[in-house]
Amino acid sequence: MARSLKKNPFVAKNLLKKIYKLNIKTEKEIIITWSRGSTIIPIMVGHTIAIHTGKEHLPIYIMDHMVGHKLGEFAFTLNFRGHAKTDNRSRR
């Protein structure tokens, strides 16, 4: 179910503070966050945000076509290794 248009998009407060500080400094720095549910807003464009995958932080460069999506959409938590191979010797 989509979020109501009456409400503002969810962005974690600590993440928003870090982005505002970097916009004032005009420095490029990787921002580390655990907030996968935060929505990407236009002031995040151009920053590199390291999103937690459950094991490590994956750095993602935010571009303008990502605005409106959630941070967690770009950092996968599962690693698909392929289906099990068919082993006819073990079957009877």
Swiss-Prot record:
Residue stretches in coiled coil: none
GO process terms (BP): ribosomal small subunit assembly; translation
GO molecular function: rRNA binding; structural constituent of ribosome
Domain of life: Eukaryota
Localization: Plastid
SUPFAM superfamilies: Ribosomal protein S19
Assigned GO CC terms: mitochondrial small ribosomal subunit; plastid
Broad class of the protein's primary localization: plastid
The entry's keywords: Plastid, Ribonucleoprotein, Ribosomal protein, RNA-binding, rRNA-binding
Classification via NCBIfam families: rpsS_bact
Family: Belongs to the universal ribosomal protein uS19 family.
Chain's role: Protein S19 forms a complex with S13 that binds strongly to the 16S ribosomal RNA.
HAMAP family xrefs: Ribosomal_uS19
Name under which the protein is recorded: Small ribosomal subunit protein uS19c
